[in-house]
Amino acid sequence: MIRTFEMELGGRPFVVELGKVAELAQGSCMIKYGDTFVLVTACASKEPKEGLDFFPLSCDYEEKLYAVGKIPGGFIKRESRPSEKATLTARLIDRPIRPLFPKGYHNDVQVIATVLSVDQDCPPDISAMIGSSIALSVSNIPFMGPTASVSVGMIDGKYIVNPTSEQKELSELELIVSGTKDAVMMIEAGANELTEAQILDAIMFAHEEIKKIVTFIEHIVSEVGKPKSEVIVKETDSELLAEVVSFLDTKLANAIKTVDKTERNENIKAISAEALDYFEEKYEGRSKEVNTILSKQIKVETRKMITSEGIRPDNRKLDEIRPISSEVGILPRTHGTGLFTRGETQVLTVTTLGDLRDAQRIDGLGEEDEKRYMHHYNFPPYSVGETRFMRGPSRREIGHGALVERALKPMIPCKEDFPYAIRLVSEVLACNGSSSQASVCGSTLSLMDAGVPIKGMVAGIAMGLIKEEGQIAILSDIQGMEDALGDMDLKVAGTENGITALQMDIKIAGIDRNIMETALAQAKIGRTHILNKMKEAITSPRTELSAYAPQVTKLKVHPDKVREVIGAGGKVINKIIDETGVKINIENDGTIYIAAPDQESARVALEMIELIVKDPVVGEVYTGKVIKIMDFGAFVEILPGKEGLVHISNLAHERVAKVADVLAEGDLIEVKLMEINPQGKIGLSRKALLPKPEKEAPKKIE
């Protein structure tokens, strides 16, 4: 039976249709938001996967180009690997729902959102995120939701739910929030240097809208929801737990307090191996149970140390930042480099400048068709002392790259002020937590070293939270162990003036406004400290670009002159390119960008274009090239693409019988422009520039 439910969301109808399509999935719904249609399905395996210590959830966001009336570009005319946008949206779907499955539930779960039609004013990503919650909630899959999601913009200090395409262009904030009725679960934001208070108000505004959507979903579940499958979780043997805890005594706590990450891991590994050997001998065949208890005890012991004793694994204070060092200009042939080291985390970021034709072409569902500023993040296995296959960027690498890109985007100069394509690549050389935020810092240093006139320096910091038995500890600059065992991962990037990017994932309920306010305030103090440390390496962008960077010159001509610069079949522009070795990009408004390998090539190309667009002036003298000899005169090119006629009578003061007696094709001669007739034809004179012959004195008659 087909059931339809409707509510208003952001001033537009939001419709959920169930029972019409994809009925064999355990949960499915069609979301209709304006003219945006998204089909979301949820399926789970019947049996759990044996031997797993994690929850095997996969979320996919399928972009179909027919949704916007496009045929895929390139040789293969079908959708293939997910776009960057699709990967990021899949992560947005995954992050808020993953913590809401029962502990110990290890069945395969797959959520697929397929975009079938797109209305640019009704975001398909938000539709997919809400749809995933509905599909899971109405299914028999044990999901402890529902969750809901909204996008928030800010124009003139006013917050807007799910802003339209036009409103996004004006907005100073791009915020996506997911949560339950009781708590915020996930935040993703980009902002134009907004204050902590403005960001926090926007999050709370979003949560009020989320509560309305969750109530709407709860009504749908009460009408059509299926009974949930029972999850059978094996309880830990309390006697075995007590024995393991007694065996560990203080040895585990001492190992956790080791400052060096590698040494700490080795110490914990040695103690765990000792415990496994002891209990394998005592209780043969129970190694798996003992190993599970050991993993839990590492978490319990670490969290207790932090909340009760205020001691972190590397003996730092809760708000203490690890030692920082910054360097620039360390690679001689690149356009800009920044090496940022914070504790045992180290990132090298390299900037490459290109002409505007190097901008990334985007063949997606949105209105954006190219991107001139790009950031890519690479996390090789050696950065954590491991081995694995390297088969292109992972979802995590794409997500971290996008976060860093968003953090710096408000600081990147517009193409009118800096007509270059900009690519940043952050190579994580060593990692013990906060590598994405180290990439923010390294990218700032690299851009400044490259001479990109950024509007301000940006630094990033990762914050953590431990909430244990009523005690709360907020941690600045978390390392890997604290990230894995904590309750919140909050990444904040910004300038001295405000926040430019924020990402938050919460693993527990009960994170209220006060906790977030404290965390953001503590992050600001840490961010300011990091910025001051970065200034020890470089304080402002270099005034000159690298000698190995392309030299881009901008010229503005009248739009009517564009055809003259291009010439018939591209003849004129290709001649300039061939003679100078430059690249030329011309826009419809008459803006011309010249990218040259050196200043001299740029100068020559610029002069050639200026001559082409220059209008001939009556009375001016030109040095021209004879391009054609006729019986009645010679055609002379005085400016590129502009030629005039020197009539035979204007070649010399004396009578000229044949033009060829005076001129030959290819000769360079000086001519004066005498007239431009109504048809635009140019009349030239060589004679006007020649001295008049002296008249012979009359002979005396004797």
Curated annotation (Swiss-Prot):
Statement: the UniProt record of this protein carries the keyword Magnesium: yes
CDD domains in the cross-refs: KH-I_PNPase, RNase_PH_PNPase_1, RNase_PH_PNPase_2, S1_PNPase
GO terms assigned for molecular function: 3'-5'-RNA exonuclease activity; magnesium ion binding; polyribonucleotide nucleotidyltransferase activity; RNA binding
Catalytic reaction(s) noted: RNA(n+1) + phosphate = RNA(n) + a ribonucleoside 5'-diphosphate
Any one GO BP annotation for this protein: mRNA catabolic process
InterPro entries in the cross-refs: ExoRNase_PH_dom1 (IPR001247), ExoRNase_PH_dom2 (IPR015847), ExoRNase_PH_dom2_sf (IPR036345), KH_dom (IPR004087), KH_dom_type_1 (IPR004088), KH_dom_type_1_sf (IPR036612), NA-bd_OB-fold (IPR012340), PNPase (IPR012162)
Disulphide-bonded residues: none
Sites where the protein binds Mg(2+): 483, 489
Function statement: Involved in mRNA degradation. Catalyzes the phosphorolysis of single-stranded polyribonucleotides processively in the 3'- to 5'-direction.
Domain (KH) ranges: 550-609
Listed cofactors: Mg(2+)
Sequence intervals crossing the membrane: none
UniProt name for this protein: Polyribonucleotide nucleotidyltransferase 2
Record domain S1 motif: where: 619-687
UniProt cross-references to PANTHER family, sorted A to Z: POLYRIBONUCLEOTIDE NUCLEOTIDYLTRANSFERASE (PTHR11252), POLYRIBONUCLEOTIDE NUCLEOTIDYLTRANSFERASE 1, MITOCHONDRIAL (PTHR11252:SF0)
Similarity annotation: Belongs to the polyribonucleotide nucleotidyltransferase family.
